[in-house]
Structures are given as C-alpha cells and as structure tokens.
Amino acid sequence: MGKVIAVCISEKKGTQKKNVGSARFVEDWGIQGDAHAGKWHRQVSLLSHEKVEAFRARGAVVDDGAFGENLVVEGYDFKTLPIGTKFRCGDVELELTQVGKECHSHCEIYKVMGDCIMPREGVFTRVLHGGTISARSWDNQVEFQVTLPKAGREGDFHG
C-alpha cells in the first residue's frame, strides 16, 4: 500500500505547485483549482516520494510540488507501471495515461542541480472517479488491467 505524502496545486501554469494538504478531484477534469486541470490525458501528475528523497540526498533543496507534481506518494516506483494501471484512494480513481514527459526548457531545478527527475520519474493520470484526497491518508490498492497495452514506451499516451 502506498501513502500520499503531499497534495499539490498551482493556480497558474509555469509556477511551482504548493502542498495544500487536501484537494477535490473532479471526474474527467483533474484537481479543482489546479492550472493543469482540463479534458486531456495529463489531469493529475504523480511522483514517487522515494525518488524525491533520493534527489534531495544529492543536495537539492526542493519542496513538495517543486517538480510540478500533484501527488507525492510513498511506496511506488511509478515509472515501472504500465499504461492503464489504476489507482484508488478513497472514492478517487485515477488511470495511468503517460509515463515521463519531454522537457522543452530546463526548469529552475535543472539550472541549479543539472538534473530534474520529473521528465523520467513522473507519471500522468486522468480522473475516472472524483472525490477528495488528503495527504497521509492513502488507502489505495493498485489494480492492474487484465489486458496490457501493445505499446508502452516512455512518454507514449494510450487513451
């Protein structure tokens, strides 16, 4: 079982997200109040707490949300999961739609550290069923679909 460490949003695109502790997830939209919400395949982004901690151990001073992630979750290496994996936290159900992303311009973290983990460690989901998620109260079970996708290379979208 995983545990949500942080729930983060930003009201404007291009700004770091801030940990708000709890947020409302809206079906086929994303997180209420988050600038990246919308009818597309990258409604909610997830990043492994362990990957963030490993990056901090290299000397990075980063707050939760600094990489643009909505959920920081302990207990999973998200990039190893196949497209279509489903996550449940209370009433909220998310479906994995993309692993990794292309970084078009280097963020402030990259400029300071020479690296950013979000493009290779972050994953994106869409909201299948809405509700509220609060930090440190994750009771999800990862459900793998019976039929795995034919493709699933990093960055591919299957929706």
Stretches found by the model and what they are:
Residues M1-G159:
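Metal-cofactor-dependent catalytic cores
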